[in-house]
Amino acid sequence: MKKLTLCALMCLFPLLASAAPPWQEVTVPSVAEAAQSFASPPRQFGAIHWAVWGGQQTKERILADITNINANGGCVYMINNSQRVMPKYLSPEYLDIVKFVVDECKKRGMYVWIEGDCGYPDGFAGGLITQDYPQLGQQGIVADAHCIIAGGKSVSFPLPSDTLGIYASQAAAAAPAAEAGQAIQIPADGKLNWYGASGSSYEVTVTDANGVAIRYSVVAGQTLHIQVPPNTRSIESTTRAAGPRGGGGPAGGAAGARGGAGGGAAGGQPTIIPDPADGQFKWTAPAGGDWDITFVRHLYRSSPTRNDAGENGGATKDSRYTEIDYLDPAATAVYLKCVHEAYEKVVGDEFGKTILGWRFDETDYTGFSPWTPKLLETFKQQKGYDLQPYIAEMFASPQSPESQRVKADYWDVWSGMFRDNFYKPLQDWCRARNMDYMGHLNHEETQINPRGESMVSNEGSFWRDLRYIGVPGIDNLSQIGPGIVADFPKIAASAAHINGHPLVWEEEGGDTSPNGKFIYDYQLVRGVNYLNIRGLNAAPSRNGLLDRASAMGWYVTRSQHLMAIGRPAAQVALFHPTDSYWLGDTEADTVTIRLQTQLIRHQIDFDHVDSDALGSYFTLDSDGFKNLSGQVYKAVVIPTSTVIQKSVLDRLRTFAGNGGKVVFVGRTPTMVVDKTFLNPVPGAPDLSFATIEPSGEITDRVVAALPKPDVKLDTPSDMINYIHRSLKDGEVYMFFNESRQTLSRTVMLAGTGQVQLWDAGDGTIHPLAGVAKADGTVAVPLTLGSQEAKFIVIGPLPANAAAAATTINAGQTLVALDGDWTVKLGATPLTTGLKSWEALGEGTFTGIADYTKTFDTPAALPQGKRLYLDLGEVNDMAHIKVNGKDFDSRGWPSYVWDVTDAIKTGANTLEVQVQVAEAGGGRGGGGAGGGAAPAGGRGGRAAPGAPPAGNVAPADVPAGVVGAPVGGAAAAGAGRGAGRGAAAGGRGRGTGGGGGGQAAATVERGLIGPVRLIAQ
């Protein structure tokens, strides 16, 4: 099919001819219009090839990569800086190479995305913030200063600088220092600036003439700035192998404990000590034991950054190169000036043309809670009360109910500041230049984690951070692969759906192997539709792009374009209880995960929604809740929650009065919040308008309360997943079999018109059989092979549709190509029957394996039939020649070619090349080019074993429960939904996350067969 011109594309999307381009806005074409672009979609929608720039970059090498990508159907090139990138980041020589990339891509009709920084997280400008704008660096609130005194003793000394709160508690045993203290010279002016070198954590102890010692925790890469007392006797540093004492964010509650209870309380209620008005701290400890006086301070502290432009070349991730103060719009403006405007001077004429936009990565607050100079002022404006008197209690442990509510107010305020002062200005800057801001947050797979870092502790609110982002995304570092349950891609897809964006990005893609295709399909069916093909690294031997990768590239491009046009069609909204997370409600997270998995496994499509959406910017009318994509929700499911916003409660009541369905599943909220969490609305909420299911499970009763499903299988299967989008006059469904068994079902689909199979592999469209029903549904026979995906469209049959799809299931085997083959893996040919490389003792082989077989056909070939070559099992990229005639490459089942025109009577020669990328061509995910997730790496929940026979709910599911329960108490073998604990020490555990580090299922490689020539 000829490439579409820009004019033709505008004809396909006439409503947007004068608006933003189709890749930036939700478009709803007709079936005929979608069919015109299916075989050759607009290239902006193409699979992204992630070019990892590590070491010395040359135009010659980069040009070879661009040429290779383009020759294999690649459309989009992403610049990604890696360790010791040269020329130096943002230097004239570096920007000249960037311009070269843009120019070469433009010549070929390709597009470019630019990584926003030189490493990650975004915000440190390759070290320029530390170098030129340290006053705009990231700041935090930490409980980092401690003074241990004996019971009954009195102390008096100058208050440590920048103190916000003070508390005292019974002292815990101090961790032993790893080495003797090193003396630090006492500064003549009293201003100590001491740098903690990379690789260690430290304590700096300042002792005065009275023997009173204050210990300050210092993280690797941080500079300690303090004013020491005039009577200072000594200063020394010690290295702490166990990390900084205390520090971190508030204890428990919203953030989860970060570094313990802020000050190492040994038990009992902490004593809150008022800040002295005169700056001189005076206190007498109660009798009995030692006391730890903890000073909660605001200071410059950065999340660790990996600066690929630094002197260590990104090898170390520490706090040396500070990120900006994300809560300060002035800092964001400087960041734009340092980085984005530097690019604009060189390639700005291609902004919104060849350059589609900017990518960000994992911007967050790691190990401390946010501070900015205007925090207290902004807090009082929004909440109506002063935060500072509560700060000490926020960090002390145990928490009082009042301090937990104050902490939730604090999270509410700073998460909004993060959105408004960093993310929104970056997106606005991009949109003003017809580009988009694209990226993912940190820990999206772990929403709340009392024992460590999480989305809520580090970034406040997933939904607020991504509220204005043009292309929200996820990071598939190692969380997704066969045998792993990881549903968290749904939250990024939901962020795009509810905010009116068509694309959802994924940082770590699959490769060009069958396992890579599983990773793509797994994400596509969960709504992620802008996928990476794993990186082009500096070393050619680690290049994840195969010479014959065009089949995978075209499959990804066609499928993700089809999944980006039209309007999302889920009718169910699953409430995401971020407000309850701020109050430390971990059960809310557990139940949210459980319901998400059960809905997916039982073909009930949904989007996550949050309080801001339901309570504010969704339109509410007689049809239901309408999001910014124009999608309408007919039901809202609310999992276990502690709190509900008054605005949400009021609108849910109106929604129910209009005929909408509201279902509370699990523990119902007992607190209603209007302006502040500190002072909630009196009384419990009236939920009489809703259905309440206390079990915390998707039961038959819950299903009965939901709208009529758009997909219903005649026989249940928790291994068939789907997603649904609506066109102007038709419906688009993607189905994916996540098991290794062939599954056949009759499926009832909402829609009217001709049922069609849209083949993303070759871009063809075929009519399918279907029986229309009077209720506006169609009964469709659906067979899905092992890990197979299919795209079904219902609507008018396009003019460019082909004949009905041919199946070889009933074909006649004309020749069985059994016996010996000539097999060449490397230099020495073998004569052997077909077996895996592992069975041949070549399990580590990478590259191209050549197979040759001569076979005879009957003297009289069947008349009126087509001849098909079926390779059987391959599990890698396969390319064939029959009697010297080339055929296209195939990268996944089924490995079948129509070879009618190449076969002759008598002797024939078949040549097969099987190719696999070298392991290590990309990060994580398993499979060729990736390598499995390491034990202890972050990952998805490992499936607890083979699904039960027939893929139906197991017998031990409680009566009335639809599918297997999910949770720590679930029995082993309880189906795909069970087992939330870590499988191999991984840290993923949040919404769709779970135990991690499980390697992908082992798959034998090579041509295994059986190989058949079939007449059909």
What do the PLM-derived regions correspond to, one by one?
Residues S30-V76:
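Mature N-terminal segment immediately following signal peptide/propeptide cleavage
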Residues C7-L15:
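Bacterial N-terminal signal peptides
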Residues D122-A183, P187-D189, N193-S201, T205-N231, ...:
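Active-site-adjacent "subsite" loops/lids of carbohydrate-active enzymes
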Residues G127, V142-C147, F157, D162, ...:
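An acidic-aromatic loop/edge-strand motif
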Residues W194, T746-V747, F855-N883, G891, ...:
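Aromatic-lined ligand-binding clefts that engage carbohydrates, nucleic acids, or primary amines
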